[in-house]
Amino acid sequence: MSSRGGKKKSTKTSRSAKAGVIFPVGRMLRYIKKGHPKYRIGVGAPVYMAAVLEYLTAEILELAGNAARDNKKGRVTPRHILLAVANDEELNQLLKGVTIASGGVLPNIHPELLAKKRGSKGKLEAIITPPPAKKAKSPSQKKTVSKKTGGKKGARKSKKKQGEVSKSASADSTTEGTPADGFTVLSTKSLFLGQKLQVVQADIATIDSDAVVHPTNSDFYTGGEVGSTLEKKGGKEFVEAVIELRKKNGPLDIAGAVVSAGHGLPAKFVIHCNSPGWGSDKCEELLEKTVKNCLALADEKKLKSIAFPSIGSGRNGFPKQTAAQLILKAISSYFVSTMSSSIKTVYFVLFDSESIGIYVQEMAKLDAN
């Protein structure tokens, strides 16, 4: 009752408040009716539309905020919104035809062009490129001989020799590294500058990438899960290469990484790294440093693809979730700080379902990092 005895004026509850959304449901209903006067509009249609738009807006704002944070800006700009949409596959497909005012354009930078400006890296191309021309001739000649023999055996031999040709091809070729036939990519995530992170369930010794990473210790021990697999596939040549590397390099420092040729493997190079043990001093920081050192070595060799196992989660005792988070964080921050990287694809080669689930989950959380 009011002071004069009349009924107290009640405030009208809006459709948005009743539905529990912020976006105006009544306005959505008017817009829908205006465009479709001949159709009956259900009560739930504008509510659902408002809820979807509210969710998409919140998602884009979160990604744009991450982009602003990574670029060390205190305010979200249209540029950050553009980067946020471009970095998320689903949003990019939905809004690829939308122009964001004052958002600028997405850079399409070829890392090779930027790297040529650096005098130190120009010499590496001359070192890597000469061998392929010599090796590429002999397999092609042997391939024609194998065809003459006929039958299925000849076809199998020719396939093996084609694999050798692709292995001896230059690391500066335009083709990106792909996993061996028969293995499917379980999850893919694209980063800002176009690098792809892919989860693959396979044997790392059979992955056809430019480099594979071998977690070891200071003495280049090859008895771990990855080391024994590579040793079995690479054979005597691989073992001799590791022994020679040990003599030449000496003990491998914690978080250190060195490279050797991938004898007997589909990969052209093997990057040996000494990751820290769980619980040791600054172990998380050193694991990130290990991953970044592996990527830096791949960049020095102008490699386009690199395959990582789950570093640290084996003998070194890191929890799988923690190891995955640190590895992905290190890779993301490396590509943010290194504008001229030649690496196009990073494979996470896993074999157990637990690790696969963890990496797929953690990659989805990367967002705009």
Swiss-Prot record:
Record's keyword annotation contains DNA-binding: yes
Paired cysteines (S-S): none
Protein name: Core histone macro-H2A.1
UniProt feature, compositional bias: Polar residues: 165-177
Binding site for a glycoprotein: D203, I204, V226, S275, G312, S313, G314, N316
GO biological process, one term: negative regulation of transcription by RNA polymerase II
Coiled-coil ranges per UniProt: none
Residue ranges annotated for the Histone H2A domain, each copy included: 15-90
Record-listed Phosphothreonine modification sites: T129, T178
Molecular function terms, GO-annotated: ADP-D-ribose binding; ADP-D-ribose modification-dependent protein binding; DNA binding; protein heterodimerization activity; structural constituent of chromatin
List of residues that carry N6-acetyllysine: K116, K123
The species this protein was found in: Gallus gallus (Chicken)
N6,N6-dimethyllysine PTM sites in chain numbering: K123
Tissue: Present in liver (at protein level).
Keywords recorded for this protein, A-Z: Acetylation, ADP-ribosylation, Chromatin regulator, Chromosome, DNA-binding, Isopeptide bond, Methylation, Nucleosome core, Nucleus, Phosphoprotein, Ubl conjugation
Alphabetical list of InterPro entries matching this protein: Core_histone_macro-H2A, Histone-fold, Histone_H2A, Histone_H2A/H2B/H3, Histone_H2A_C, Macro_dom, Macro_dom-like, Macro_H2A
Quaternary state and interactors: The nucleosome is a histone octamer containing two molecules each of H2A, H2B, H3 and H4 assembled in one H3-H4 heterotetramer and two H2A-H2B heterodimers.
Any one of the GO CC terms: nucleosome
Record PTM: ADP-ribosylated.
Function: Variant histone H2A which replaces conventional H2A in a subset of nucleosomes where it represses transcription. Nucleosomes wrap and compact DNA into chromatin, limiting DNA accessibility to the cellular machineries which require DNA as a template. Histones thereby play a central role in transcription regulation, DNA repair, DNA replication and chromosomal stability. DNA accessibility is regulated via a complex set of post-translational modifications of histones, also called histone code, and nucleosome remodeling.
PROSITE patterns per UniProt: MACRO (PS51154)
